[in-house]
Amino acid sequence: MKFKDFFVIGTDTDVGKTYVSTLLYKALKKYNFQYYKPIQSGCFLKDGKLTAPDVDFLTKFVGIDYDDSMVTYTLKEEVSPHLASEMEGIRIEIENVKRHYEDLKKKHSNILVEGAGGLYVPLIRDIFYIYDLIKLFNLPVVLVCGTKVGAINHTMLTLNALDTMGIKLHGLVFNNYRGQFFEDDNIKVVLALSKIKNYLIIKNGQKEISDKEIEKFFN
């Protein structure tokens, strides 16, 4: 398998981007992958310091210690990063994010970067968005999408935006699949419209991605 760094984004806020990132990291950790969350809002105090909930979830799920090196900016307010940073008087410096990413690359073979929501989430008001960060890192995207009603529209809009922006798609991950007939049709329609061949389906409650699936997805 020829691994490379990649950037995980979602079609919507609650599509399960962190859960999918966690399953991917769990499967790829043995290949010296590292997880990186550049900016996390909605953080909570634990042992006197702000803790990133996504990092906390991932490390507990995988069974490793919480790792401060997995996140650059931790913000308390549970709102978009640009607004949380304004409310808390914290200036987001993209150069710090870039430097952190480059430092991680020196220690690990590959990096799995998890964004904050979708492509148009602002990191710095009117200046810098998630899609800018993807372009800065020059990474292909793993797009996490749902399977429920509305998934076709959300997924196709994001795919079209990626194409317009010139951002490469590595593959799709259909998350939280429950085996309903309309989910099967939603997946079928998205794949037919997009002509995408590289995808994963994560079932509701799935705890791991098999080596066979990983090999196929990253081959």
Curated annotation (Swiss-Prot):
Amino acids binding substrate: 41
Keyword Transmembrane helix: no
Residues binding Mg(2+), per UniProt: 18, 54, 114
Cofactor: Mg(2+)
Cellular compartment(s): Cytoplasm
Keyword check for Cell membrane: no
Its EC number(s): 6.3.3.3
Main localization (coarse): cytoplasm
GO molecular function terms attached to this record: ATP binding; dethiobiotin synthase activity; magnesium ion binding
Similarity remark: Belongs to the dethiobiotin synthetase family.
Subunit structure: Homodimer.
Protein name per the record: ATP-dependent dethiobiotin synthetase BioD
Lineage: Bacteria, Fusobacteriati, Fusobacteriota, Fusobacteriia, Fusobacteriales
Gene from which this protein is expressed: bioD
